[in-house]
Swiss-Prot record:
Keyword vocabulary terms for this entry: Antiport, Calcium, Calcium transport, Ion transport, Membrane, Transmembrane, Transmembrane helix, Transport, Vacuole
Region (Cation selection): 143-178, 339-374
Top-level taxonomic group: Eukaryota
Name of the gene encoding the protein in the UniProt record: CAX1c
Parts forming coiled coils: none
A GO term, aspect molecular function: calcium:proton antiporter activity
A cellular component annotation (GO) from this entry: plant-type vacuole membrane
Record-given protein name: Vacuolar cation/proton exchanger 1c
Species in which this protein is naturally found: Oryza sativa subsp. japonica
Described function: Vacuolar cation/proton exchanger (CAX). Translocates Ca(2+) and other metal ions into vacuoles using the proton gradient formed by H(+)-ATPase and H(+)-pyrophosphatase.
Bilayer topology annotation: Multi-pass membrane protein
């Protein structure tokens, strides 16, 4: 029989423990939310989409399906875009049966949307396995696989204009349309309020994007200011472009080192061992698909993406003539919107939840990857294969890129955001889109004048 005093003391301790659980749980939830928002860097722009869009199947169904079947269900049906996978066999059938090129192009373009989302999901899964530094590089490599593959096929078929337009369109879409929509819809949810904004990752991305714009402008200006002959001028422009590509790559990987290694504490909270929910999610994912399986699926998805990208590149001009839409408009406006639909939707959803820092990570991170990683890699590949390519994106395209980066920089210059800032970015994108649509008449007018 315990003394009354000890029993009273025991009950008092139990009550204090129960009372203390609620504040500690609230603090833990708040820290988890901050950690999720702070974990975004430009090197991991595509990972959050894959993390948030998970399989809706129950654990019981997964156990009943078994190993390979469970992986098939997880990878193909684990996204809300899974109905669009039906466009993949339709594209193959349209190509095999020699149907209209418009159908091949349309089905291929639609099929790229779920493939891009699944590639992001698989690369994020692998990145979580190999560690933060290697994972950041992995996400940087796989985050824009569709754009990279389309660019490589355009390079192989010597369609330089389509190559440059598709890459430019991805940058413009992320900076103006997606970021603008995120600020717009997130601001409407918080109408009448100014929300705080973390500028640290935005400053890094904007600095890299401005460096990329400088390289493009330098190449453009050098082509028109040189007094030497055409062949000498072309050689000088090519040398300048290749030098700039090397500088851009060094700067990009330097930014990765800055964010993932030397100054990592600035961009994300310190990891602790209390991340129980994350470890539970990881355990669930590992029980369905492991590292080796994820690599196999990633390679398979990349192969299918390459096939559809080949269809898009080979049919885009004929589809343009059939639809009466300029190739430049399709390459700059339509391709990026459809190809990155899942990633774009994720950015807007996070803005709805007042997680604008994650939206910044998605949009600015993807734009930075295209500008400072994909573009110079494509140029170096063309250099190795003796294919002439430079950083001159033409006057209108370079001007649009410069204005997009400058407009975004001014929009994010303070630590507040509201819907009007998003509205300005969206309107800027609409003006550029209309410009590329109506400019189709200029070549015809010039020929008639001659």
């Amino acid at each position: 029989m315990a003394p009354p005093e000890s029993s009273h003391h025991h009950l008092l301790e139990s009550g204090l423990l129960e009372v203390s659980k609620a504040p500690s749980a609230a603090v833990a939830a708040e820290e988890e939310e901050k950690k999720e928002a702070a974990a975004w860097t430009p090197s991991s722009s595509s990972s959050m989409t894959g993390r948030k869009i998970k399989s809706e199947a129950s654990p019981l169904l997964r156990r009943l399906l078994g190993g390979p079947a469970a992986q098939l269900q997880e990878v193909l049906l684990g996204t809300k875009l899974y109905p669009l996978f039906s466009a993949v066999p339709l594209a193959v059938a349209a190509e095999s049966l020699r149907l209209g090129r418009v159908w091949v192009f349309a089905f291929s373009l639609i099929g790229l949307a779920p493939l891009a989302e699944r590639v992001s999901f698989l690369s994020e899964h692998i990145a979580n396995t190999v560690g933060p530094t290697a994972g950041g590089i992995m996400n940087a490599t796989c985050g824009n696989v569709p754009e990279l593959i389309i660019a490589l096929f355009a390079l192989h078929k010597n369609k330089m204009e389509i190559l440059k337009w598709s890459l430019l369109g991805s940058i413009l879409s992320n900076l103006l349309l997606v970021l603008g929509s995120s600020l717009l819809f997130g601001g409407i949810v918080n109408i009448g309020k100014e929300r705080p904004l973390d500028k640290r990752q935005a400053d890094v991305s904007i600095g890299l994007l401005l460096l990329g714009v400088l390289c493009h402008i330098a190449t453009l200006v050098s082509k028109y200011t040189s007094s030497t002959g055409d062949s000498i001028n072309s050689s000088s422009v090519m040398q300048l472009s290749r030098s700039c590509a090397i500088v851009m790559l060094i700067a990009y990987f330097g930014s990765l080192m800055f964010q993932l290694k030397t100054h990592r504490q600035i961009f994300e909270l310190e990891e602790d061992s209390s991340d129980s929910s994350s470890s539970e999610d990881d355990a669930t994912d590992k029980s369905v698909i492991g590292f080796a399986s994820a690599m196999v699926w990633l390679i398979g998805m990349a192969v299918v993406t390459a096939m559809l990208s080949s269809y898009v590149v080979t049919t885009i001009e004929e589809a343009s003539e059939s639809m009466g839409i300029p190739v430049r408009f399709i390459s700059i406006i339509l391709l990026p919107i459809v190809g990155n639909a899942a990633e774009h939707a994720g950015a807007i959803i996070f803005a709805f939840k007042n997680k604008i820092d994650i939206s910044l990570g998605i949009t600015l991170g993807s734009a930075t990857q295209i500008s400072m990683l994909v573009v110079p890699v494509i140029l170096i590949v063309s250099w190795v294969n003796a294919i002439p390519m430079d950083l001159d994106f033409n006057l209108l395209e370079t001007g649009s890129l410069a204005m997009a980066v400058i407009t975004t920089a001014f929009t994010l210059q303070d630590d507040k955001w509201h819907y009007l800032k998003g509205l300005n970015l969206v309107f800027s994108y609409i003006v550029i889109a209309v410009c590329f649509f109506v400019m189709k008449a200029l070549p015809t007018l010039k020929k008639e004048d001659d």
